[in-house]
Amino acid sequence: MNYFAVALGGFFGAIAREITGRALGTSIFPVGTLAINLSGSFLLLFFMTLFLERINVSDPVRLGLTSGFLGAYTTFSTMTKEIYLLLFQSKLLIGFAYLFLSLSGGFLSGILGRALALYLVNLNFRKNGAKDEG
């Protein structure tokens, strides 16, 4: 069941990546891949935090969303290829800027996703706690 959930999530994640990449278009700077990877980092830590802190979901749901959907949605290999091509084409500043933005931005996006999830968990806890006391 877990393999099926990961495969199904991966199917939809790959489609979402293709749609998002096409919608953002192409330019000298790989905005599409950067946006996909940053949003994927945000969503991965957001959902993992919710699953660990508050929401009890089955393994197939958790794995289908995280390893499946978000694993197929984000793309480390495409980022690596794009950085290589930029450097190979002597676009050093753009290549290194993309590398820096991808790594630091992915890390910061993940932190923001986790922070939002913790905020929502605590907000929900305060609301439910206040109702129980009244």
UniProtKB/Swiss-Prot annotation:
Keywords: Cell membrane, Ion channel, Ion transport, Membrane, Metal-binding, Sodium, Transmembrane, Transmembrane helix, Transport. GO terms for molecular function: fluoride channel activity; metal ion binding. Belongs to the fluoride channel Fluc/FEX (TC 1.A.43) family. InterPro entries: FluC. Pfam families: CRCB. Na(+) binds at G71, T74. It is a multi-pass membrane protein. It comes from the Bacteria. This is Fluoride-specific ion channel FluC 2. The chain crosses the membrane at residues 1-21, 28-48, 68-88, 92-112. It comes from Carboxydothermus hydrogenoformans (strain ATCC BAA-161 / DSM 6008 / Z-2901). PANTHER family: FLUORIDE EXPORT PROTEIN 1-RELATED. Fluoride-specific ion channel. Important for reducing fluoride concentration in the cell, thus reducing its toxicity. It catalyses: fluoride(in) = fluoride(out). It is found in: Cell membrane. Na(+) is not transported, but it plays an essential structural role and its presence is essential for fluoride channel function. GO terms for biological process: cellular detoxification of fluoride.
